[in-house]
């Protein structure tokens, strides 16, 4: 079964239909049912509960969450993909127990109405909102952001109802299963990677605002400063040599962590991670490569918590911050002309980076 174009996906959403959305065309991908929240009916909720079987969620923009005075469930997500769950909600009026398909549909409409405010909903409830990152899939390549983006492109409020698709036996549906599901229910299938491509034709959320040569202990680098217009934050890239050649360059996408980069703290289990200095040294040894430095301000409390997390012997989930910033780092690499790369990282599944015309051909772990 062929993957449908984003234009076809948007048209079905505009008509109030559901679609299936995967990360990309990989056979191991899972998929969500998705439709515009403004168009949801009780029968749609019933279909999602009966056939999708996952957790029915409502994707909302940060602005809408503020409008509803809706706080995040936790201030820092420890989920593997950094999903921003808010407190669950119920419509303040017009529902009974809240769990029926009609009640859940009513709750969704109460939350996405133009004039909706905090008085229109109560907590807890049977609908689980997810707060999308500003910038949508160009900043975080997730189903939450894709739901908001697709609803907006289709002409509706930037809010969608999504649910993971599970098989009869309770396992997650993969592409082969999703194709059979789509054929059975006459649904179109799209990908977040294609949505990223679609948006990049006309928009982006980062721009290079300065370039200058700097001399470091590892040699000369060209320092590029980027402005993330979605969050009004600055990030940097350090480039050495000609990275536009036929051979994939070394690439490190690095998120600042003072406990690691300044104090040199390492995991008690012996696992070594790439510090900023190690990455720069590795690039200098080879003579060509890129270090993208994504900078997010840290307070003393943030650093203290980070230290506790790094020295704890308890296994930790990783990748949540990485997952959230895939889009930002990918846009910077695109701007620098990188396509195929040898990534300074332990093996990690980077969602939908094909949408940015990027491909990891090799992972290089820190030794």
Predicted regions and their residues:
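Catalytic domains of riboflavin
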Residues: 1-367
């Amino acid at each position: 079964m062929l993957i449908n174009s984003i234009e076809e996906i948007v048209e079905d959403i505009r008509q109030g239909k559901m679609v299936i959305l995967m990360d990309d065309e990989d056979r191991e991908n899972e998929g969500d049912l998705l439709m515009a929240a403004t168009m949801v009916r009780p029968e749609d909720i019933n279909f999602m509960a009966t056939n999708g079987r996952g957790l029915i969620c409502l994707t909302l923009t940060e602005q809408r969450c503020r409008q509803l005075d809706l706080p995040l469930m936790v201030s820092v997500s420890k989920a593997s993909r950094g999903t921003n769950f808010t407190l669950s909600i119920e419509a303040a009026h017009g529902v009974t127990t809240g769990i029926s398909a009609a009640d859940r549909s009513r709750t969704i409409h109460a939350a996405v109405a133009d004039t909706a405010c905090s008085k229109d909903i109560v907590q807890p409830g049977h609908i689980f909102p997810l707060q999308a990152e500003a910038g949508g899939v160009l900043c975080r390549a997730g189903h939450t952001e894709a739901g908001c983006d697709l609803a907006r492109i289709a002409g509706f409020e930037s809010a969608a109802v999504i649910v993971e698709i599970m098989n009869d036996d309770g396992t997650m549906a993969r592409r082969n299963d999703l194709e059979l599901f789509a054929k059975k229910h006459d649904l179109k299938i799209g990908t977040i990677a294609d949505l990223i491509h679609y948006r990049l034709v006309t928009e982006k959320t980062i721009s290079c605002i300065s370039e200058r040569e700097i001399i470091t202990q590892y040699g000369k680098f060209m320092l590029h400063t980027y402005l993330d217009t979605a969050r009004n934050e600055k990030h940097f890239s350090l480039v050495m040599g000609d990275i536009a050649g036929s051979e994939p360059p070394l690439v490190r996408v690095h998120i600042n962590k003072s406990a690691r980069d300044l104090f040199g703290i390492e995991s008690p289990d012996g696992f070594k991670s790439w510090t900023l200095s190690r990455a720069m040294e590795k690039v200098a040894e080879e003579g060509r490569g890129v270090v993208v430095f994504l900078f997010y301000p840290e307070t003393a409390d943030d650093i203290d918590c980070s230290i506790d997390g790094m020295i704890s012997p308890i296994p930790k989930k990783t990748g949540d911050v990485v997952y959230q910033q895939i889009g930002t780092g990918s846009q910077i690499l695109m701007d620098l002309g990188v396509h195929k790369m040898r990534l300074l990282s332990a093996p990690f599944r980077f969602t939908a980076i094909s949408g940015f015309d990027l491909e990891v051909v090799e992972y290089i772990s820190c030794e």
